[in-house]
A protein has these predicted regions:
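N-terminal Sec/SRP start-transfer signal
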Residues: 1-4
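A structural signal for multi-pass alpha-helical bundles of membrane permease subunits
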Residues: 6-7, 12-299
Length: 299
């Protein structure tokens, strides 16, 4: 093999080894959480620790789904059935789904219509709006928490899921609109003009020509909005004070309250929290890449 070939092979080995190491570091906490969630309580703190459970059990997942969980059991302290965070897990899961889907639907609807208007109609200030919107996204979301909380108090929306939906729309809409604006710019206007010449109305062109063409951008913006809404902790912690209306990110923190932490139950909750977004991302990742790559070259 020539020196150049040896150098190329060495580069590939270093690159793939580095990528493998980075992937392992990223995935190991999730693998350990999955392993812990499948272990019985007696094995979680066993020495030496094992990544692969010696005996697999689904009791932690069953406790979360059914809402039946017990506190720590030992020889001098029998397990007692009491009000535990596991009893509210399904409720929190549904709350998170409602808030995530609701805020995503509103953000995508507004950003798509706004992006279409900014790229297809001529009016004063349209060239500045996208840049001002992305500036709004660059501001840390924690700055908006107190003003939005005061607004929710005035509207009597505190401790409601609607307050979370509106809060998440306020932090996801700027980037979604900028992303859709960049994508709409890449769609040739000649396609719409041809449909208009054929007798289609503006709404028909938008529904049957623009939206299907802009689908990768819409999916990319939707994934972004869903991830932000699903993972947020700050707004849920400030806006909600009832245990029934909590979302998963806030509710899971209640597993740490008290003198004992049920690590098997906690890890099972963390694994279940990652499942919805992991499924969405894996199913739509090719659209995500196409959406974020849109606008690099204007059509």
């Amino acid at each position: 093999m020539s020196p150049h070939g040896l150098w190329t092979a060495a580069q590939r080995i270093v690159i793939y080894a580095s990528l493998g190491a980075i992937t392992f570091v990223i995935c190991f906490p999730l693998l350990w959480a999955l392993s812990t969630s499948l272990k019985p309580k007696s094995e979680i703190f066993a020495t030496p620790p094992t990544l692969i459970p010696r005996s697999v059990t689904l009791e932690n997942y069953g406790a979360l789904v059914t809402g039946r969980a017990q506190y720590f059991q030992s020889a001098d302290r029998p397990a007692v059935a009491a009000t535990t965070p596991a009893q509210f897990f399904v409720r929190w899961f549904v709350n998170s789904l409602i808030v995530t889907l609701g805020s995503t639907l509103i953000s995508i609807t507004i950003s798509t219509l706004a992006a279409y208007s900014l790229t297809r109609f001529r009016y004063w200030g349209r060239s500045f709006v996208p840049y001002f919107s992305i500036l709004g996204y660059m501001v840390p979301s924690i700055i908006f928490v107190f003003p939005l909380f005061l607004v929710m108090v005035q509207l009597d929306l505190t401790n409601t899921l609607l307050s979370l939906v509106l809060g998440y729309v306020s932090i996801t809409l700027p980037f979604c609109m900028w992303l859709m604006w960049a994508f709409m710019r890449s769609i040739p206007i000649e396609i719409e003009e041809a449909a208009l010449i054929d007798g289609a109305t503006r709404m028909q062109v938008f529904a049957h020509v623009v939206l299907p063409t802009a689908l990768p951008g819409i999916i990319a913006a939707a994934i972004f909005s869903m991830i932000v809404s699903w993972n947020d902790y700050l707004f849920g912690r400030v806006f909600i004070n009832s245990i029934d209306n909590l979302t998963l990110t806030v509710g899971v923190m209640l597993f740490f309250e008290g003198t004992h932490v049920d690590w098997g139950l906690l890890m099972a909750a963390c694994v279940l929290m990652t499942v919805p977004m992991a499924i969405v991302f894996m199913a739509l990742q090719r659209h995500l890449a196409a959406g974020f790559g849109a606008g690099a070259v204007k059509g």
